[in-house]
């Protein structure tokens, strides 16, 4: 079912996560090298059917949040409330000025959500208006009294474990939250419960066993171990590119259009920084080089923007179930000066690759006036990429 309706997502990240132990709010803790909240937000930020991602955070965490999700595109964070329910309402109100048709509400403490689950949520909301992802209960459940004695054994065939993202028509869930606030009801533990209370029929759709919520220190230990074991094949690749100057008034460097008194002589846009990164990633995959995937003899790549090449290389990693641990590029030139451009370059590479800025390094050097770069005849770049792949992969995308 195609999505002709506008869909937004709310990421609830205002909690303190005290049960997860020391180390700050759990959504900002690192999990196998990436912040939990980055993992939770990225699938929504990159999903083709979602036009806006609205985080809800504690104002006290502003700097932590900014660093943790650098490179992702999202709405300005809404300040969280005293409860999860209050935080969700704040996110809904923040979206109301440009109201979507459908809204997905997801907990930042669930970092294993994927695009398939998000797509199922969107379709479920389109069909039913209110839906929650669930998984089957596999353990026997006991109901107890205040003394801890068993008083009942519910039929587990009729029980389900609820997850997020929960999906709703925006207008109905906003009104349900507003009504709950007016009536002083602040005791709901999820948004489906508010919808039920408001008289809505809440449907279920297929959740994902992997989409677990991180709650305790043991959860972090277990998932660190699992992710480390899954991605234990560590690869490193290097790349190099050079382009001569020609006529022009700008050059493309690391995804930025940089004013200059010369241009590049190149088949594509000549971005030596991104080209070197592409070669480094492909080299780590043992998957050829940029010229084998984008031949300079092919007219379709004439003047092409090099961010397409880098996105392609990143997709090759993803296709093997891997991820990029670190990218580094060194620009070698006399001019333009790279220092003032370093942080914008890191940000742009983060936007293209979906990596946290903390995993991207941009460096610069000169050749001390020696050679073609010293004579300002062109610019060179070297790069390295460190990848983590599942054991048993051959490094080649299918």
Curated annotation (Swiss-Prot):
A divalent metal cation binds at residues 241, 243, 275. Residues 235-398 are annotated as: 2-C-methyl-D-erythritol 2,4-cyclodiphosphate synthase. The record marks 19, 26, 267, 366 as: Transition state stabilizer. SUPFAM superfamilies: IpsF-like (SSF69765), Nucleotide-diphospho-sugar transferases (SSF53448). PROSITE patterns: ISPD (PS01295), ISPF (PS01350). 4-CDP-2-C-methyl-D-erythritol 2-phosphate binds at residues 241-243, 267-268, 289-291, 365-368, 372, 375. It catalyses: 2-C-methyl-D-erythritol 4-phosphate + CTP + H(+) = 4-CDP-2-C-methyl-D-erythritol + diphosphate; 4-CDP-2-C-methyl-D-erythritol 2-phosphate = 2-C-methyl-D-erythritol 2,4-cyclic diphosphate + CMP. Its cofactor is a divalent metal cation. Disulfide bonds: none annotated. CDD domains: CDP-ME_synthetase, MECDP_synthase. The keyword Transferase applies. GO terms for biological process: isopentenyl diphosphate biosynthetic process, methylerythritol 4-phosphate pathway; terpenoid biosynthetic process. Keywords: Isoprene biosynthesis, Lyase, Metal-binding, Multifunctional enzyme, Nucleotidyltransferase, Transferase. Pfam families: IspD (PF01128), YgbB (PF02542). It comes from the Bacteria. Pathway: Isoprenoid biosynthesis; isopentenyl diphosphate biosynthesis via DXP pathway; isopentenyl diphosphate from 1-deoxy-D-xylulose 5-phosphate: step 2/6; Isoprenoid biosynthesis; isopentenyl diphosphate biosynthesis via DXP pathway; isopentenyl diphosphate from 1-deoxy-D-xylulose 5-phosphate: step 4/6. GO terms for molecular function: 2-C-methyl-D-erythritol 2,4-cyclodiphosphate synthase activity; 2-C-methyl-D-erythritol 4-phosphate cytidylyltransferase activity; metal ion binding. Residues 1-234 are annotated as: 2-C-methyl-D-erythritol 4-phosphate cytidylyltransferase. The record marks 156, 213 as: Positions MEP for the nucleophilic attack. In the N-terminal section; belongs to the IspD/TarI cytidylyltransferase family. IspD subfamily. Bifunctional enzyme that catalyzes the formation of 4-diphosphocytidyl-2-C-methyl-D-erythritol from CTP and 2-C-methyl-D-erythritol 4-phosphate (MEP) (IspD), and catalyzes the conversion of 4-diphosphocytidyl-2-C-methyl-D-erythritol 2-phosphate (CDP-ME2P) to 2-C-methyl-D-erythritol 2,4-cyclodiphosphate (ME-CPP) with a corresponding release of cytidine 5-monophosphate (CMP) (IspF). This is Bifunctional enzyme IspD/IspF.
């Amino acid at each position: 079912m195609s999505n002709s309706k506008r869909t937004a997502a709310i990421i609830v990240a205002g909690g303190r996560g005290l049960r997860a132990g020391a180390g700050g709010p759990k959504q900002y803790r690192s999990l196998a090298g990436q912040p939990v909240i980055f993992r939770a937000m990225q699938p929504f930020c990159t999903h083709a059917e979602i036009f806006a991602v609205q985080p809800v955070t504690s104002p006290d965490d502003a700097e932590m949040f900014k660093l943790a999700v650098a490179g992702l595109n999202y709405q300005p964070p809404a300040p969280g409330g005293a409860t999860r329910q209050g935080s969700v309402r704040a996110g809904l109100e923040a979206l109301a000025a440009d109201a979507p048709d459908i809204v997905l509400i997801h907990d930042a403490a669930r970092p294993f959500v994927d695009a398939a689950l998000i797509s199922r949520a969107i379709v479920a909301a389109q069909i039913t208006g209110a839906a929650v992802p669930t998984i089957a209960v596999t353990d026997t459940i006991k109901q107890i009294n205040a003394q801890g004695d068993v008083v009942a054994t519910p039929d587990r065939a009729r029980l389900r474990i609820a997850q997020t993202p929960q999906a709703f028509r925006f207008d109905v869930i906003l009104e349900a939250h507003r009504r709950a606030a007016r009536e002083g009801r602040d005791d709901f533990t999820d948004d489906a419960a508010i919808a039920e209370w408001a008289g809505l029929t809440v449907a279920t759709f297929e959740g994902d066993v992997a989409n677990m919520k991180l709650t305790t220190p043991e959860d972090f230990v277990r998932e660190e171990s699992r992710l480390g074991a899954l991605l234990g094949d560590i690869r490193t690749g290097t790349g190099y590119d050079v382009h001569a100057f020609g006529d022009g008034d700008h050059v493309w460097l690391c995804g930025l259009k940089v004013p200059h008194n010369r241009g590049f002589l190149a088949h594509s846009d000549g971005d030596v920084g991104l080209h070197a990164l592409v070669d480094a990633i492909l080299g780590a995959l043992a998957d050829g080089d940029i010229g084998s995937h984008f031949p300079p003899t092919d007219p379709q790549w004439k003047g092409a923007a090099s961010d397409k090449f880098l996105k392609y290389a990143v997709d090759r990693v993803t296709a093997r179930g891997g991820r990029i641990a670190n990218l580094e590029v060194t620009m070698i030139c006399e001019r333009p000066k790279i220092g003032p451009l370093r942080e914008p370059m890191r940000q742009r590479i983060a936007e293209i690759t979906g990596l946290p800025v903390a995993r991207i390094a941009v460096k610069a050097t000169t050749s001390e006036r020696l050679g073609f770069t010293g004579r300002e005849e062109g610019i060179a770049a070297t790069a390295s990429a460190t990848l983590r792949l599942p054991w048993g992969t051959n490094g080649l995308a299918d």
